Regions:
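Catalytic nucleophile-loop/oxyanion-hole region of alpha/beta-hydrolase
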Residues: 20-22, 49-78
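Alpha/beta-hydrolase-fold enzymes
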Residues: 89-172
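Active-site glycine-rich loops that stabilize anionic/oxyanionic intermediates
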Residues: 10, 18-21
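Conserved alpha/beta-hydrolase
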Residues: 30-53
């Protein structure tokens, strides 16, 4: 876990990254928040980046939630309003974290292309076989089916990812089954977000997450203060796209309302 402190902080952003990636891919976004007066707290999820766990493998999705809980506790010690920004699987983790809290003490929440359904189609034979392998060989790793050019149109990011040894390309059978189980759980209606301001921003040309499932979740979520913005033509990683400065301005305009 790392902390980047602003000179005169008005808030603290906890960033929860997605599958395959790690904190090093967020240097630009971290600096944008920090230079705008926000502390940033972020770590690498279990099995990803510099974490010591087996790459691409978890025993339970709860491991992610427990890890993020530590980051949020750290953010609370910085004595500034705490905001969460969950991207992709990080958005799914954020949703499930909220559902487990009685008093989340979060000022506002941003979800970026949250993983609430997969756009990529998994081989049906593999999908069926994974149910048995989840019991017999849960740590067996298979190709994730994702490639850097599916996530963004940013050529610099694509090249960096293709040459990054920390970028996860294989995931375990258990990871896959836990992801699907958690997506199903997230779609169950909840009032966990009733009182927290929520901004959901979705890539309009997402090649990874099913934006129709994202829309369905957003339409069904109970909230007194929620807003949805779809970025036409943008791929999955809206904060890495060529238009990312415009996307960031929209995110900051949202958080600035609550400082």
């Amino acid at each position: 876990m790392w902390t980047w402190k602003a000179d005169r902080p008005v808030g603290t952003i906890v960033i929860i990254h997605g599958a395959s990636e790690y904190h090093g891919r967020y240097k630009w976004l971290v600096e944008m928040w920090r230079s705008s007066g926000y502390n940033v707290v972020m770590g690498d999820l279990p099995g990803q980046g510099t974490s010591t766990r087996a790459r691409g493998h978890i025993r339970s999705f709860q491991e992610y939630i427990d890890e993020v809980d530590i980051w949020i506790d750290k953010a609370r010690t910085l004595e500034a309003p705490v905001f969460l920004l969950g991207h992709s699987m990080g958005g799914l983790i954020t949703i499930e974290w909220f559902k487990q809290q009685r008093n989340p003490r979060i000022t506002a929440l941003i979800l970026s292309s949250p993983c609430l359904g997969l756009q990529i189609k998994v081989n049906k034979v593999l999908d069926f076989a994974s149910k048995g392998l989840n019991v017999l060989a849960p740590s067996l790793r298979v190709d994730s089916g994702l490639s850097p050019d599916m996530a963004t149109r940013n050529a610099d990011m694509i090249e960096a990812d293709q040459n990054d040894s920390l970028y996860v390309t294989k995931v375990s059978v258990r990871w896959y089954r836990e992801l699907l189980k958690t997506i199903d759980a997230a779609m169950v209606p909840t009032d966990a977000f009733l009182k927290v301001p929520l901004l959901l921003m979705q890539g309009g040309d997402d090649k990874i997450v099913d934006k129709m499932k994202v829309r369905k979740w957003f339409s069904g979520v109970a909230s007194h203060n929620k807003s949805y913005r779809e970025w036409e033509g943008l791929y999955h990683e809206i904060f890495n796209e060529p238009e990312r400065e415009t996307v960031f301005k929209a995110a900051k305009a949202f958080t600035d309302q609550y400082i």
